[in-house]
């Protein structure tokens, strides 16, 4: 994922 992009943040997590």
From Swiss-Prot:
It comes from the Eukaryota. Coiled coil: none annotated. This is FMRFamide-like neuropeptide YLRF-amide. Keywords: Amidation, Neuropeptide, Secreted. The modification Phenylalanine amide is found at residue 4. It is found in: Secreted. One of its GO terms (cellular component) is extracellular region. One of its GO terms (biological process) is neuropeptide signaling pathway. Belongs to the FARP (FMRFamide related peptide) family.
């Amino acid at each position: 994922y992009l943040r997590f």
